[in-house]
Design a protein with these regions (language model features):
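N-terminal alpha-helical interaction blocks
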Residues: 1-103
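Activation/maturation switch segments at domain boundaries
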Residues: 1-7, 11, 16, 92-240
Length: 240
């Protein structure tokens, strides 16, 4: 006998967050090991040992379940959607571990999200920034199905194998130059209501949404650039 919708929801609300936490902790532990091993390869003046930070994805996991049950047509789609979302949440444990330790490390390393082979235009745009991030929460740009790798740089880095930031910057610059005039004209013609569709937000490690109340031309331009990069490179804009 199959479960009722209510029973299915209750089961998933209990099991899914626990699954995310269990595998997320494994990802965080792997990130700590990698961080410490990488740090040891540099001749640094300060001592520091990375640790797993306090990470709580419970409410985000609850949201994953409830949204999926609302949107999915059948149990097969529920399984598929939650499988993809759980992969994202688990990778966020690694992201948060890198960013938390980089912020506390007296060596003040920079960090970046390295695009994977076949990455979408959004991830290539993020990757084009290279090792420049220094603010809490910037790696919240990960999306569902994203397999990009977070990493840190302690200075004088020999580079990451397969990561060509200059090439990504060329992609970005070419796309931006081709859409800037059009974007500026379109933004000027928009009504206040239309502009409200374009805001800049980020998610903190505890799941809070910050920013996003004020229309942002930069957010609109960013979307135009991503769209143009996708067309020029014949890739997806944003892999959901």
């Amino acid at each position: 006998v199959g479960m009722t919708d209510t029973q299915t929801q209750a089961y998933l609300l209990q099991q899914y967050p626990a699954l995310v936490k269990a595998y997320g902790n494994l990802a965080a532990a792997a990130a700590v090991e990698y961080y410490n091993d990488l740090r040891a390869t540099y001749d640094l003046d300060s001592d520091y040992t990375a640790t797993i930070p306090e990470i709580n994805k419970h409410y985000q996991a609850i949201g994953d379940v409830n949204r999926t049950l609302e949107e999915a047509d059948d149990i097969t789609q529920v399984q598929s959607n939650l499988s993809a979302l759980s992969g994202r949440r688990v990778m966020e444990y690694a992201d948060d571990t890198f960013t938390d330790n980089a912020l506390r490390d007296p060596a003040h390393p920079r960090w970046a999200l390295i695009p994977h082979a076949g990455a979408c235009a959004w991830c290539l745009l993020i990757g084009s920034n290279g090792f420049v991030y220094s603010e809490d929460g910037v790696l919240a740009s990960r999306h569902t199905h994203c397999k990009c790798t977070p990493t840190v740089d302690f200075g004088n880095s020999p580079g990451v194998q397969g990561f060509n930031q200059k090439k990504l910057q060329r992609y970005y610059s070419t796309a931006r130059a081709s859409v800037e005039d059009e974007a500026r004209t379109q933004w000027a013609a928009m009504s206040p209501e239309e502009r409200k569709k374009y805001t800049r937000t980020r998610t903190t490690r505890d799941g809070r949404k910050v920013g996003g109340n004020t229309p942002s031309y930069d957010a609109y331009l960013r979307n135009k650039i991503v769209s143009r990069m996708a067309k020029q490179l014949h890739i997806a804009e944003h892999k959901h």
